[in-house]
Design a protein with these regions (language model features):
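Adenosine-phosphate binding glycine-rich loop
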Residues: 55-160
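Rossmann-fold NAD(P) dinucleotide-binding segment
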Residues: 24-31, 41-59
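Short amphipathic alpha-helical segments
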Residues: 17, 47-50, 70-72, 95
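A general structural motif
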Residues: 19, 36-43, 62-67
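Fold-independent oxyanion-binding glycine-rich loops
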Residues: 6-8, 38-40, 61-62, 86
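Glycine-rich phosphate/diphosphate-binding loop of Rossmann-like nucleotide-binding domains
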Residues: 1-34
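Short coil/turn connectors at secondary-structure junctions
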Residues: 1, 31-32, 54-55, 77-78
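Short, glycine/polar-rich helix-capping loops at beta-to-alpha or helix-loop-helix junctions
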Residues: 10-13, 44-47, 66-71
């Protein structure tokens, strides 16, 4: 797997194990299997989206990486898998919830155990999300369903 990095600050692209695209403003014209935008909101606009139609997946680590909902819907209709930012960025929220609602378990556990729990919870939600996408629901509909879903406080589910 090749991992490419681009940033307006070229020094930030010097990451071991990656291929730097430097500060290339036309980075999106390259062919990628997976894109993980970790930058400003609205990065993927209509102009950029047209170059991403061969991409297999976009994992949205940036908050609101698409310029508007129509862009993400067009990419979804082109069979590009999009994992939305609320799912991708859930780890910190889950860890905070453990610390708040299970403080005893939090204080006696090793970080690796928390990471494993977080990874498991995020993975479950991502698979549930992908299953609902395949059933024909839109990202917006799924996120509303997940938001309105009644469930236990996730931090209380962590048992060390």
């Amino acid at each position: 797997i090749k991992t490419f990095v681009v940033d307006i600050d070229i020094k930030k692209t010097d990451i071991s194990g990656t291929i730097s695209l430097g500060d290339n403003k036309n980075w999106y014209k390259n062919n990628f299997d997976v894109i993980l935008p970790c930058s400003i909101s609205g990065l993927i606009n209509t102009d950029i989206a047209q170059f991403l139609l061969k991409t297999k997946a976009i994992i949205s680590a940036a908050n609101a990486p698409f310029g508007n909902d129509l862009i993400s819907e067009k990419l979804l209709k082109s069979n590009i898998v999009i994992i939305p930012d609320p799912l991708v960025n859930a780890g910190a929220v889950i860890a905070d919830s453990i610390e708040k609602y299970s403080p005893d378990a939090w204080s006696r556990t090793k970080p690796a155990e928390v990471y494993k729990f977080v990874q498991c919870q995020v993975r479950k939600k991502c698979f549930a999300y992908l299953s609902l996408i395949q059933s024909g629901l839109s990202s917006k509909e799924i996120l509303e369903l997940m938001h309105n879903e009644k469930s236990d406080i996730i931090g209380k589910l962590f048992i060390n």
